[in-house]
Amino acid sequence: MSTWANLGLQDSASPLMEQLIFFHDHALLILVMITVLVGYLMFMLFFNNYVNRFLLHGQLIEMIWTILPAIILLFIALPSLRLLYLLDEINEPSVTLKSIGHQWYWSYEYSDFNNIEFDSYMIPTNELAIDGFRLLDVDNRVILPMNSQIRILVTAADVIHSWTVPALGVKVDGTPGRLNQTNFFINRPGLFYGQCSEICGANHSFMPIVIESVPVNNFIKWISSNNS
């Protein structure tokens, strides 16, 4: 989760988020190099006294500054396209979770199991435990197994919502009358926080998401206890 004065991305908890961070660093490096080069050229042009009175055209330099940006754009576009296709792949999920956005809470259904569904509301500040996180903790967490492929189906009951967990690199719009899906793989245990990322009304900022990643054995015990 984001911490106080944190300006960077959250620590990744899935292979997809790791790839997103790598792409961010790759694109940022290229942008910094371009900025430094342009700044250096502008500085040198402003503070030198050299003048070429016979310069009419420069076909070579025009070719260079046309072809070079095209090559740079390819270096950014190709990794981006690869990542877009990776984000859309569904790889034989072990668990399917359905999330339904409401004004202003989430409801969840474990589609592979009978009778496991619940609503998840934000805990009000006056009811929060001393170690709770304001505007982020919920009364019912989503329990998911680590090291397992998870598919999530997202829809909405009223207006457009967006189910987002930054540490997992997941952001899926919930649209009324439509099922959107994506997949993710949690590679470590822990609590991962997210929020609705589509303005959906007065209490838009009060519908957080909390995922608790647990070992598979613990997940099976939790499923068994809820089924019984």
UniProtKB/Swiss-Prot annotation:
TM spans (from-to): 27-48, 63-82
Subcellular location as annotated: Mitochondrion inner membrane
Pfam families tied to this protein: COX2 (PF00116), COX2_TM (PF02790)
UniProt KW keywords: Copper, Electron transport, Magnesium, Membrane, Metal-binding, Mitochondrion, Mitochondrion inner membrane, Respiratory chain, Translocase, Transmembrane, Transmembrane helix, Transport
Cofactor binding remark: Binds a dinuclear copper A center per subunit.
Annotated residues for binding of Cu cation A2: 196, 198, 200, 204
Sequence ranges on the Mitochondrial matrix membrane side: 49-62
EC number in record: 7.1.1.9
Membrane topology per record: Multi-pass membrane protein
GO biological process: ATP synthesis coupled electron transport
Cofactor: Cu cation
Stretches of the chain found on the membrane's Mitochondrial intermembrane side: 1-26, 83-228
Major location (coarse): mitochondrion
Function statement: Component of the cytochrome c oxidase, the last enzyme in the mitochondrial electron transport chain which drives oxidative phosphorylation. The respiratory chain contains 3 multisubunit complexes succinate dehydrogenase (complex II, CII), ubiquinol-cytochrome c oxidoreductase (cytochrome b-c1 complex, complex III, CIII) and cytochrome c oxidase (complex IV, CIV), that cooperate to transfer electrons derived from NADH and succinate to molecular oxygen, creating an electrochemical gradient over the inner membrane that drives transmembrane transport and the ATP synthase.
Family according to the record: Belongs to the cytochrome c oxidase subunit 2 family.
Protein name: Cytochrome c oxidase subunit 2
Organism: Drosophila yakuba
Gene responsible for this protein: mt:CoII
